[in-house]
Amino acid sequence: MSKIFVNPSAIRAGMADLEMAEETVDLINRNIEDNQAHLQGEPIEVDSLPEEIGKLNINEAKPQSFENNPIDIDGRMNEDFQMKEVEDPSIQFQSYLDNIGIQIVRKMKTGERFFKIWSQTVEEIISYVGANFPNPSGKTTESKSTQTTPKKVKPEPPSAPTEKPEQLSRTSMAPETTSGPLALDWSATNDDDDVSVEAEIAHQIAESFSKKYKFPSRSSGIFLYNFEQLKMNLDDIVKEARGVPGIIRLAKEGLRLPLRCILGWVASSHSKKFQLLVGSEKLSKIMQDDLNRYMSC
């Protein structure tokens, strides 16, 4: 007959756990009793009350009729309304977002693509906000100046549309520069994007944030560079990456992005070290080749 040997340390640990559990149960019971002491019918000693409270007299006054005092009625209604207020909706929304985050992690562990998960999650969040945070209807936003006699305002002539400096700098890039790549082919334009597109771009960049890519150097050699060396926030990198032609379309379709092309695009504008090391002509060629290869897939 075989004997089972039990380690004495395991027994002592189990006994300690049992003692801690008993102490926890006793503490909970004491807290419950303390919190429900006012329900036990225990008398309150008047002598133990503060002096100011002891001087108070309790008179059985007749209840005032609210019919003759409409102000009291309104006050009572306001108090009742405040008593019936529900929990702060922002707290409920925060717990809802926490649950959404847990669901996203679980789906990603099963191998489902982040772009598909995020697009479904955005729709769920929009429907939740629309159901629990309705827009107040019937409210107008008229200014007080409309109550006075309106003054005739001369219409201003329409001004010519102005482009952002960033767009001007992108479109007016010279075919050859000393500190950056050549101008890329803008035949593949970027359409209006949404939050899910930015999320897909950020997801793919984050996956390869420390991966090093080969770039041509000025000395006819190569050097390695990655997104970490940019010393930039991921959000800023995503904003710059949106300027690469065709990136938004690839992200919308959930396809792989030309990360080396994106890295070269961002680094050529924000990294002085990269500008000093890279060969501009060769960089432009490999960026264009990467972009054409990914767009043709």
UniProtKB/Swiss-Prot annotation:
One of its GO terms (molecular function) is RNA-directed RNA polymerase activity. A motif (Nuclear export signal) lies at residues 49-58. SUPFAM superfamilies: Phosphoprotein M1, C-terminal domain. It comes from the Viruses. Gene3D superfamilies: 6.10.140.1560, Phosphoprotein, C-terminal domain. A motif (Nuclear localization signal) lies at residues 211-214. Residues 131-187 are annotated as: Disordered. Residues 134-150, 168-180 have a biased composition (Polar residues). GO terms for cellular component: host cell cytoplasm; host cell nucleus; virion component. GO terms for biological process: symbiont-mediated suppression of host innate immune response; symbiont-mediated suppression of host JAK-STAT cascade via inhibition of STAT1 activity; symbiont-mediated suppression of host JAK-STAT cascade via inhibition of STAT2 activity; symbiont-mediated suppression of host type I interferon-mediated signaling pathway; viral transcription. Phosphorylated by host PKC and by an unknown kinase. InterPro entries: PP_M1-like, PP_M1_C, RABV_P-like_C. The modification Phosphoserine is found at residues 210, 271. Keywords: Chaperone, Host cytoplasm, Host nucleus, Host-virus interaction, Inhibition of host innate immune response by virus, Inhibition of host interferon signaling pathway by virus, Inhibition of host STAT1 by virus, Inhibition of host STAT2 by virus, Interferon antiviral system evasion, Phosphoprotein, Viral immunoevasion, Viral RNA replication, Virion. Pfam families: PP_M1. Non catalytic polymerase cofactor and regulatory protein that plays a role in viral transcription and replication. Stabilizes the RNA polymerase L to the N-RNA template and binds the soluble protein N, preventing it from encapsidating non-genomic RNA. Also inhibits host IFN-alpha and IFN-beta signaling by binding and retaining phosphorylated STAT1 in the cytoplasm or by inhibiting the DNA binding of STAT1 in the nucleus. Belongs to the lyssavirus protein P family. Homotrimer when phosphorylated. This trimer is stabilized by binding to the L protein. Binds soluble protein N, and ribonucleocapsid. Interacts with host STAT1, STAT2, and PML. This is Phosphoprotein. It comes from Australian bat lyssavirus (isolate Bat/AUS/1996) (ABLV).
